[in-house]
Amino acid sequence: MDYTRAGARLQVLLGHLGRPSALQIVAHPVSGPASPANFCPEQFQYTLDNNVLSLEQRKFYEENGFLVIKNLVSDDDIQRFRAEFERICRKEVKPPGMTVMKDVAIAKQGYAPSERVVTKIQDFQQNEELFRYCALPQIVKYVECFTGPNIMAMHTMLINKPPDSGKKTSRHPLHQDLHFFPFRPSNLIVCAWTAMEHIDRNNGCLVVLPGTHKGPLKPHDYPKWEGGVNKMYHGIQDYDPDSPRVHLVMEKGDTVFFHPLLIHGSGRNRTQGFRKAISCHYGSSDCKYISVKGTSQENIAREVIEIAEKRYGVQGALDFEDTWKFRCRLVKGERINL
């Protein structure tokens, strides 16, 4: 299969070059109600037949593109994920392939290694402790409602939104996750995003634009923010600023599942604490890779390839598809295409 060939090719390259430690990168809300789940579609488009979601939950996701499940992840699991994150921040753990990101405003201040300087870790699929999140049975049973039984963990994050420095760099611009993904169909992709503590507008909760998952993928680029923008924080260049928005106030353990075309972002953290959340983007292994050449995704493809080539010390040996094939990991079922 392609993923075997690509993985083997990269493994050979890395075998000669050795694997470096995790790369470190310097990295106007209007509230509105979600649409009521009172419609009867002729055919469900965004959810699969199952006995997990109630009819009302299924209708809500179909109409709005997201669904919050309360108290899904235990306090004990969240504490374990927090402890492992702190070990990574202290550089006691260096899983292969993981990216450690710093806030663009904080990175210049020269703090010692700690959670104070790390704003996010990405691609922790090879860290067995954090990967437990991706495989939690209570998470996976909901994921299967969107992806079907063959489930891949495609992209993982533990987000540590820092107190804003005053430059508003702790914001995450409104975006669609599909901008970052070279695989389709989008309806077989879902994100699980779990609050690791109480999250509200004060510390930068998620904000979503209900129903936008029904629209197209929009062009993304870096927003022109005066205080600077974190690495790979692309945002939508064209959206209706008057669109209704919902701010997701969540308690520790609450989990939101959302579609990759749903427009969402987060505000700045106005508190003195660090706002933590853990997430995984899942895709059905029946999805297929696509070429993004000539599309609005070319800009992120160039950026990801550049980072991967720098990490692995290779030039011209990778394409966008390779970077995903090497990172993703099977969660359940059979690995078919991805």
Curated annotation (Swiss-Prot):
Query: Is Oxidoreductase tagged as a keyword?
Result: yes
> PANTHER family from the entry?
PHYTANOYL-COA ALPHA-HYDROXYLASE (PTHR21308), PHYTANOYL-COA DIOXYGENASE, PEROXISOMAL (PTHR21308:SF1)
Q: Which residues bind Fe cation?
A: 175, 177, 264
Q: Which residues are recorded as binding 2-oxoglutarate?
A: 120, 157, 175-177, 193, 266, 275
Quote the protein name from its UniProt record. Phytanoyl-CoA dioxygenase, peroxisomal
The source organism is Rattus norvegicus (Rat)
Quick one: where is this thing mainly located? Answer: other
User: Is Aminoacyl-tRNA synthetase among this UniProt entry's keywords?
Assistant: no
